[in-house]
Amino acid sequence: KSDREVMAFCQSFMTELCKYIGADTDVPAGDIGTGAREIGYMFGQYKRIRGLYEGVLTGKGLTYGGSLARTEATGYGLLYLTEELLKLNGIELAGKTVAVSGSGNVAIYATEKAQQLGAKVVTVSDSTGWVYDPEGIDVAALKEIKEVNRARLTEYKKYRPNSEYHEGRGVWNVKVDIALPCATQNELHLEDAQALVANGCIAVCEGANMPTTLEATEYLQKNGVIFAPGKAANAGGVATSALEMS
């Protein structure tokens, strides 16, 4: 869709939504497919209709009330918690291989921070398929594909010829030390948990909201896998949104 089409949709959506939200009522934030651009269009329409400049949406741009590093906050926070959780168990994050699902804000910046901390992320995914890069995901290429070109991961192989693109699901079948589900709800099922355990995965930390099914969670915990639920693991974004609201 063109920017104009996206703007028209966001403005129409907010024309109705503004009746039900407010700084002291409900405060929406971005999620899958909704970033600073879309939040900006909606915030502009809210101001136009209500005549109020208040903390009614989070994830805005820095020039109109956003918080520094809000885009990175959820992914970065996930890795800070993962690193500390591993340390509590006498394990270093550096040198570990990591599977990440998704390729939105959470996944991109979780991948970036993981590699800054010395781990190697070898997978990312989107709604059509997933990429395996044994040399480690190229974050700059991933950002260009997803944030600039708004394209599919099928483009990744143009940047990294040695990588593999697979259609459908399959991220959790790769042999890794750590799994970070960062895509969507209920994406990691019991059979995925069984594959992770069989491949020697030592930790699963949730970047998305409730990405691991109850059966999968119970299986991971029963098999001694370190598990961090999203309520704690992805709270970096919420914490930074609170700063934006204030």
Question: What would you call each of these model-derived segments?
Answer:
Residues 183-246:
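Rossmann-fold NAD(P)-binding glycine/threonine-rich loop
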Residues 7-18, 39-44, 76-83, 108-115, ...:
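Predominant activation on well-ordered alpha-helical scaffold segments within soluble catalytic domains
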Residues 58-61, 66-175:
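Glycine-rich phosphate/diphosphate-binding loop of Rossmann-like nucleotide-binding domains
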Residues 1-68:
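N-terminal ligand-binding/catalytic initiation module
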Residues 1, 62, 66-76, 228-240:
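Conserved phosphate/anionic-ligand binding catalytic regions in large, soluble enzymes, centered on
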Residues 33-38, 126-131, 233-236:
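Glycine-rich beta-alpha junction loops
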Residues 22-24, 91-96, 174-177, 196-203, ...:
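Short, surface-exposed connector motifs at secondary-structure boundaries
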Residues 25-30, 51-57, 100, 123-126, ...:
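General beta-strand structural signal in soluble alpha/beta enzymes
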